Amino acid sequence: MKKLVLVRHGQSQWNLENLFTGWTDVDLTEQGQKEAATAAQLLQKEGIFFQTAFTSYLKRAIKTLNIILDVMDLDWIDVHKTWRLNEKHYGALQGLNKKETAAQYGQEQVLLWRRSFDTAPAALEYSDARAPHNDRRYQRVARQDLPLTESLKDTIARIMPYWEVVIKPVLIAENTVLIVAHGNSLRAIIKHLKGISETEITDLNLPTGIPYVFEFDDDMNLCADYFLGDTEAIKKLQESVAKQSQ
């Protein structure tokens, strides 16, 4: 049995402030650090350990992974960081309050920007200081590959080649893999793994810091998927994520 574990980063400062974050590099809150430690304890309790982990270029995911590995005494394992696991780029929405944006443009429009399959927010201007090509962490990435906004469809196109060429072969070889990333980058992977439709993906909400386990047979057929933790508590957290723009 092969196990893939997905963890959305712990609560970030902009999660707490209910701001669109995207590729903005914000830190974890104290609560986010606690969520990461709790995720590690849940994995230990289940007896799930790793030799390889993957994360994004953004510190909220990197620090969540570091805490998990430290608590599990797995600081020595191989860690691969890639910009391809970054959050969906929210374009000109980055830094705006979700409720205030909903009040201005309507909840339906904001829901489309947040959760729909192929609707992207307004793009950043190329000259905007927030544009990824102005950030030195992306200096080795071709400029034409760096987004100024993204839909979930765009995010999937960015992530899935890396899944197929890099992550999936490691999972096949090692049987367990950990990915610590972001709500929409993980939704992209989940849509692929579960064959979720473009319409149904709108309703998938991932709470911060909760391990989501996928089990596969030796032929990489999906056998089961489940969250670790209290079912009712996780359901309430998912509902809270869904209501962020209300």
UniProtKB/Swiss-Prot annotation:
Signal peptide: none annotated. Gene3D superfamilies: Phosphoglycerate mutase-like. Keywords: Gluconeogenesis, Glycolysis, Isomerase. Pfam families: His_Phos_1. It comes from the Bacteria. One of its GO terms (biological process) is glycolytic process. InterPro entries: His_Pase_superF_clade-1, His_PPase_superfam, PG/BPGM_mutase_AS, Phosphogly_mut1. Substrate binds at residues 8-15, 21-22, 60, 87-90, 98, 114-115, 183-184. The active site is at residues 9, 87. Its EC number is 5.4.2.11. Pathway: Carbohydrate degradation; glycolysis; pyruvate from D-glyceraldehyde 3-phosphate: step 3/5. Catalyzes the interconversion of 2-phosphoglycerate and 3-phosphoglycerate. Belongs to the phosphoglycerate mutase family. BPG-dependent PGAM subfamily. Homodimer. This is 2,3-bisphosphoglycerate-dependent phosphoglycerate mutase. It comes from Dichelobacter nodosus (strain VCS1703A).
